[in-house]
Amino acid sequence: MHLRHLFSSRLRGSLLLGSLLVVSSFSTQAAEEMLRKAVGKGAYEMAYSQQENALWLATSQSRKLDKGGVVYRLDPVTLEVTQAIHNDLKPFGATINNTTQTLWFGNTVNSAVTAIDAKTGEVKGRLVLDDRKRTEEVRPLQPRELVADDATNTVYISGIGKESVIWVVDGGNIKLKTAIQNTGKMSTGLALDSEGKRLYTTNADGELITIDTADNKILSRKKLLDDGKEHFFINISLDTARQRAFITDSKAAEVLVVDTRNGNILAKVAAPESLAVLFNPARNEAYVTHRQAGKVSVIDAKSYKVVKTFDTPTHPNSLALSADGKTLYVSVKQKSTKQQEATQPDDVIRIAL
């Protein structure tokens, strides 16, 4: 009995030590895989530059206390702030022209767009996109998503409202070239296939709209689901090589994969209601933020299955990728309401893929 008891005690001790080592190993791996840093209040979209080796974050700051906002330049490895660019207008949406190294930020509440030199942080110019004064009857359209065509130095900006538009801006002189009309209710989603000369937008009418960027005319519009349910296709990201679009729905627990040639649905990926989506051609994966669930999903673009989930409380918002596709960045918002603003700054998470 004594020998058996001694053996059992040693065995239990070995198993406990082994379990602790495994847990420690997983914890260390998780810590190496994910870095989280508090940056500033009102965090929204990001832009990454390989040339400048930097990540920029648009923040609107406090709704009540701050008139303007701040664009933070971050070290993409440590997430430390290396520059704070103060603006009198609040920035929300973000993109970058990698050829001209010009950052573009949508000033949603002012119906404007601001161009900033990525190298210096100097404001290059600003353009008011809808100069109508807000009244009870008039609601100026608000810029939401931005995409830059490096080849033509053109910036496309979704202007959302009951009947949305897409503004087409000359990146050289920062002037409005044209506005593509009738893109539906709240056409928030925006994605560009520069080589194919196609621009895609999605809206709260449940449509995918295809636009020819050669003449800025709508080529087609298709209601993606005819199931009698409400859908808000809020964001879109392209796999241009395989002519696929990954589309998030804030009203349904699924992500759609759509053939961009005809609008046919290739797959429905089960996932919580979604916000941002970003396709990574280097890994053939798509990343999706689930604002209410507080998670980020990794979708295998071959099997159309969620293969990994990251816990990113409280409200994961926007996504950005490093140029090599090996690092994912997530902006994460704290709980905040109109009555009670968040007391702590919002975060940026760096995930090693």
Swiss-Prot record:
Gene3D superfamilies assigned to the protein according to its UniProt record, in alphabetical order: YVTN repeat-like/Quinoprotein amine dehydrogenase
Which InterPro entries does the annotation name?
Haem_d1_sf (IPR011048), Host-pathogen_enzymatic-act (IPR051200), WD40/YVTN_repeat-like_dom_sf (IPR015943), YNCE-like_beta-prop (IPR048433)
Q: What induces it?
A: Repressed by Fur.
Alphabetical UniProt keywords:
Signal
Q: Which GO terms describe its cellular component?
A: outer membrane-bounded periplasmic space
Q: Which top-rank group of organisms is this from?
A: Bacteria
Q: Which Pfam families match?
A: YNCE
Annotated GO molecular function terms are: DNA binding
Where would one find the signal peptide in this protein? 1-30
Subunit info here reads: Monomer.
An additional note in the Swiss-Prot or TrEMBL entry is: Preliminary crystallization indicates the presence of a single beta-propeller domain that contains 7 4-stranded beta-sheets.
Question: Would you tell me the protein name for this molecule?
Answer: Uncharacterized protein YncE
Q: Which organism is it from?
A: Escherichia coli (strain K12)
Q: Which gene holds the coding sequence for this protein? A: yncE
